[in-house]
Amino acid sequence: MNIANIKLPEEWQLDLYKKEKISKLKSDRDNKEVEPIKYNGFLYDYDSKARERINAAIIALDDMGAGSRINWTTYNNYDVLVTANDLRKIIANVAIRSNKLHTVYRLAKEKVEQATTKEEVDKITLEL
């Protein structure tokens, strides 16, 4: 018997479809978490390398003393002066965005789990 010719019961097909959708929603959420973040009118990178640089810069700026600034290249290649507090606020903005994304993901996941048709599943997105 060729396994490719086996037809799963409709309920199983829907369950698999839901699992795929939830996996895609999670991937979308994770990708949005590392998108550039807006602060003071500029976009800042927030991938793993950028996070390391931001954290190192905060330490350096704190060590340099109150009011210290460094030149920072934004996502769009603008050079701006930032303080340790600016960099902390960027991290805070990311935390707020991350919380929203996780909340929206959980709600979308619940909707997928409650859906009774593939069409219902297809309509579900991460809406911020």
How would you label these PLM feature ranges?
Residues 1-128:
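A preference for well-ordered globular domain cores
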